Amino acid sequence: PQIIDALVKRPADGLHIIFIAQNLGRLRAVFEALEGAVCFLRAGDLLLAQEDVCAFARRRGGTLTAAQAGAIVRSTGGWPAAVALCLEADGATGEMDELLYRLFWMRMDAGQRTALLRLSLFDCITPDMIDRLVPPGTLPEGGREELFRRTPLVRQDAMRRRYYPHELLLRFLRERLAETEGPLRREIYRRAGQWYRDNGITRWAVDCFFRAEDDEGILSCRLVGLIGECFGETSYTALARMVLRRCPEEVQRRYPLSLLRLCYALYGGCEFAEFARQMTRIRELLADSGAHYLGEWELLDALAFFPDLDGMDAAYARAEKLLTHDSELFIPEEPFFFGCTSMWYLFYAEPGQMMTTADRLAQVLKRYDRLTNGHAAGAEELYRGEAYSVQGRFEESDIQAYQAAFLSEQAHNASATYGAALLLGINAIYRSDMAGLQKAVDYLENKARSYAFLRGTAIGRYMVETVRGYLLGLMMETGRSALWTQGGADTLADLTFTNFMIKTCRITDLLLKKEYQRAIASVEASLALDTRLISAAARNFMYCGLALCYLATGRLGKAAEWLNRSLTIAEQDKNYSFIACFRKYFQALFLMPSIAARHGEAIREIKALAIHYTRADESRIFAMLDDVPELKEALTDREREVAQLAAGGMRNSEIAETLHISENTVKHHLKNAFQKMNIDRRSRLIEMLR
């Protein structure tokens, strides 16, 4: 804000400063306060009003009545391209498709229509493309210029010899293409797919081949960087399953690497059973493809043993004997382990073995990196840094995060690079180091720009928004995360390694909105998922989240049950950081005998952990905290004794007689116990002291 204010107050020296943003976020108030000094151009300013339409008509040499101009505005919403179309049609109004149909489509001959359909899958058209996509004889000699002269909503760049159809026109033409008879429609999609494939635009090549029902066309593409993509309503995982099941085996044999890449997509989409079936079948198809592809198969089949590092290492050892050069399957464009940005979430599978796993992971990935030219570079350092972080060893964690960043950048391992940014941000938030958090965010944004091969891809978007969204979740500012990470993002049907962490942020969003029941339902359903997705790290996070949710709804018994599970996992490796973030909320549960007796040492360590995480307290997640005092200390032996007798149904006088103390002393002990336990009535004692 200060920089913006300084720029606004600069002397008038002819320098124009332009801010372009889809969403100004927290700067909106700053710009609104500077309204008199800043010239705004909003989306609404680009629409034409009734008087603008009349002026537009006059510039074209015509006139309109106020009624005609008003009808055009109502029909088009003031969208300039649509208004221009209405004026070309002599003021006719109606739905956009209707206008386009009447204005030019019905006036085109069959050849011109076919030519436009063949070009409708491109937003930039060159003469070379026309020669390749439109068969000879479709247009008469010199018909190209006539075609575009008669077609509205096409911008021509004469110098560069390019045509740019407007989105309105493309939408209309693609709807006409969908209505075209099957053979011609498929042939149009097939030719477009070939052009996209030959020009290295794989995403659109696959889309076109899929619509053309051309499985060999799909297999002929370089199927890289497609995790998370959708083709119409079909996910890439579903597409992979369809192609592997229906494409003739004699065709599949010609594309061994593509078969393995489709199997990789199956595992990435968590279709574990289908992955196992197809890998068994493909092993036989690869028998005559040479040792290298059998080595690639062994590399990929290591996923069948995940998260068993010994099993994975044995598969890598088998691959090492077969591969003749670096892997073609595991390359930077396919981020390590489907773009998951947390190695701790992936590989922490057995409580009590967290640091042992770090050592074993280093050994296994050393072999893997030899075979893949450093595909997992930085992953082992990231895991170790995350392990230190959950133990509260933040300085050591930062060192590991920086090492992960340096190593992963050299090998272009985006998963570890983005994971390092996430870890540095988490550590900064836990220490209330906002300058450190800003450095982590800046680092993330710089890396997002430098990994050009991820730009514009679904997996790239998932990875960046995972880091950004997770940090915003810890900051209790989920409303600033990407829209697709909000709303119904807690659904489980599309849960994968790639998007798991961003979906956990949705739980924070639900807590902030006090939708505790929905959060409980989502988390408890997640616990029943495949253990490859729900690791020990994820399970501990979920147990802690359920304890918070039940605590928020006042169900202290259920909250204690889930906190007990969380502490049982956490104390085996002393990974207390996340629980410590909410220790203020958990103080009432820490006092319960069922918790204090089992986890006394863990509770003392959690209270002593050097975490200065203020966001949870400032956000006031739980309505129940609004009216209760903060817990200061545990119950004394006498307070516990009095409270337990009261919970058993005794009156104050009966307690006094039993313990041989005065009734006023009983009242004093109960008052202290109520304050320490965050309760205001005796009925809660039964649940708290069980």
Regions found by a protein language model. Give the residues of each.
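Alpha-helical sensor/transducer elements of the RecA-like P-loop NTPase core
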Residues: 2-71, 75, 81-86, 168-172
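C-terminal boundary/linker of central alpha/beta nucleotide-binding cores
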Residues: 67, 98-178, 187-190
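Linker/hinge segments immediately adjacent to helix-turn-helix/homeobox DNA-binding domains
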Residues: 89-97, 499-525, 529-539, 544-637, ...
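Extended alpha-helical scaffolding segments used for macromolecular assembly and cargo binding
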Residues: 183-259, 265, 274-278
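Alpha-solenoid helical repeat architecture
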Residues: 203-204, 215-219, 254-257, 289-299, ...
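Amphipathic alpha-helical segments of tetratricopeptide repeats
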Residues: 227, 244-248, 280-288, 317-330, ...
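Internal alpha-solenoid helical repeat scaffolds
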Residues: 250-420, 426
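Recognition helix of helix-turn-helix DNA-binding domains
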Residues: 649-684
